[in-house]
Structures are given as structure tokens and as C-alpha cells.
Amino acid sequence: MENIAHIFCNPEEEYWTIPPIKSFLKENDVKVDNVSAIKENTKTKLIDAAMDFAEQNEENKQIFIEWIDRTVKEGIKEIILHKCQMDEGMNLTFANEASTRKFLDMYVDTESTGYLINSKYDNKTRMVKYTLSKIRDKRAITLYFGKMITYIDKRKSKCRDIEFPVIFEYFIDEGWYLVRYKARSNLYEYHPEFQNEYMKTDYPVQDSKLVQEAVQQAMHILQLKEITGSEQSYFLKKMFYRILKQFTETPPEIKDRLDQYKNNIISMEQNIKELCRISEGQTFSLHSDLCNLFEKYISINWLDKEIFTRHRKAYPIKLRATDEEDSHVDQTAGGDSGPLQSKAIFFDNKRMIDNDEMCDGLTLKWKRSVRTYYPETFTVRISEKRGKCYLSFKEYTAEEDIQDVLFSIIGA
């Protein structure tokens, strides 16, 4: 198959991991015998089997290249989520599918195959394709951009030219855009006229610059304007706090135990007020502190830690926050030792976070909807920078699971 074995099929590029390849082979009844116990050999063998399937006939080829575009969109990804406004004049253009397609067709590269694979790439960022869809009943326009760059593997002293895809998605009615890409380093501008690899090192480029080039094109095409300013940062940190509260609600078992100690808390509160001569204005703070203290020690000594995860689709393992006095909190559960809510450090700073109702960022263990060949959970890091929401998926994550995270944020 022409040019089929390029970046998206290269085992070294990590666009695929073993689980999605196995899923593809299973869906298409492809059996692979004598799979090695060595991970690298297994992956190569599975990719070869997928490509053999694609080369059997045109129908298989079409199934394969459509699957590639889907898997490049999901997986190990960095995602930027940002609020934006569309020019009012574009409402009529995007009112129906026919007018939308007529408009977007003007911007698709003339040498594109209509897919990421086998399209022509050079040192210019080009729109390779677009799709119109409804994602969870929300209208979306997805633009696929690509550019050729040079990657230098400094450990092996080798360089190779690779495609750098950037996927831009705009939710028309919600006013959000998101950008997906695979984080990379050791990248250089593509100069095919240079035969000597040392000459190529004179033109380094950051992946963020490549992403920005695609975003600027997309914003121009769709006539979007970013919503900027400190209020956007404030808005996101409030959203993160609501997500944190959603996934750290006090479990019913612990609420029941706190109710049992209600009289003890009231008695201690009265004693402290008398001993320390606390004013009425500080009474509420004292009561909250005592409730937090009781909940802390009940939680960290509760034997069944699954009460903090059992009926939740996600739970935090790390969070960051800063209060109005610039006191900084950086909490972690310590590796994969359990949910942050079962740790003393969570309660040590809970009052500060609840007072401001803001969170700078958090890392969550998220339960997968798609579990065949995958572990039960994946990790996602959520943060804010200059009014934009950044999500980092460091392990292969299926599209359905990525959407779970995205719409939990958008809907917060």
C-alpha cells in the first residue's frame, strides 16, 4: 500500500499502543499467532497484521485508513480547551451542513487524500480534512492540520522526517474550542534540501509553535476570537473547584459517623470557646475546623478506602491551589497509593480551598468506559495557564473516555 507505513504506523512513534491495535484486529476478525512475550516484538507483529489486513483489498484499506484517523485523534495526547466567540456573520454559514461543507471545502489542501495517511506534507501547515459531527448532541466542526518536520533522535544519532498532526475541534453552540496534539521534543524545521543532518539542527522548533500555527489557521478559517483576560483564569479555577467537590463528596458512611459525634463536636466547640475566649464572629470558623478535624481522622483511619472511589467515575490523586494571601498548596497522594481524600494532607488544606472555592489544577484517576484490553483507570492532569485549560493524557485513552473528561469540565 502506497506510503502506508509512515509515522502513524511506526511502532517508535507511539501513536498506537497494544490495546487499540488488538481491538482493531478483534473487530475485523484478524487472528495473530505466535505473539512474542517481548512487548516491542508484540507491537511490531500486531501492526504488521493490521497492515496485512489493509492490503488485502480496497474495502479493508478504507476501514484501516479511517481507523488511523480515529486513533490519531485519541490516545496519548495534550489537549488545550479554551472559550471563544464566533463572528456573528458565520452563524448563517454554519446553519446547515450543506453551507458548512461548501465553506470549508475552500480551505482543504488540494493535494489532500481526505485522510491523514498518504496526504502530501511539506514545511507549511495545511488543512488536510474536516469532519462535521454531533458529539454527545453538541454540534462540532473538526479540522485536521498537518506539517512535515524533522525529528532527531540524539541517542541513536539519527534523524527522520515525520508528519506533525494537530486536530482542532470547535463546538458551535457551546463556544469552546479544543486542540489535540502529541507532545514532542527534538524537533527541527523541515528542509529537504539539506542532506547533512547537522545543518538541520540550525532550525529548532518547539511543538507549541507548530500547534499555534494550526490554531491561528483554524481561528482564521472559522472566524473565531479567543476570550482572554484574568476573568477567564478565574472562571476555569472555579470550574476545577466544582470538579474537585464533585469527586470528593463526603461518603455516606463517614457522614453517618460524623452525625454520631455531633454532640462531641458541640461540646468541644463550647469548651474551646470558653478556654480561648473566642468571639461570636469566629464561631462558624471554629465549628468548620472541628468538623474537618473529625472527618480527617475518621477518613484516614477508615479501613475500606474504596468508599472514596466506589461510586465515582474519578477521584483526585493530586491538586494545586493558591489562596488570596498567596499561600500555596501542592498535595499528592503519593504514587498510586490511593485517593487523595484518604490522606491527611487533603484535610490539612481543605478549609483554605473551600474558603476561596478555587483550584489551580488537579490530577485525577478516571474510570474507563472502554475497558477491553485496557487497565481499569487512566490518569489525566488538568491545569490552567493564561486563561486556557490544559489536559494531559500520558497513557493511551480512548475517544469516549477523553470525551467524558472534556464534558465533565465544560459542564462543571
Predicted regions and their residues:
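Intrinsically disordered, low-complexity, charge-rich terminal extensions
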Residues: 1-412
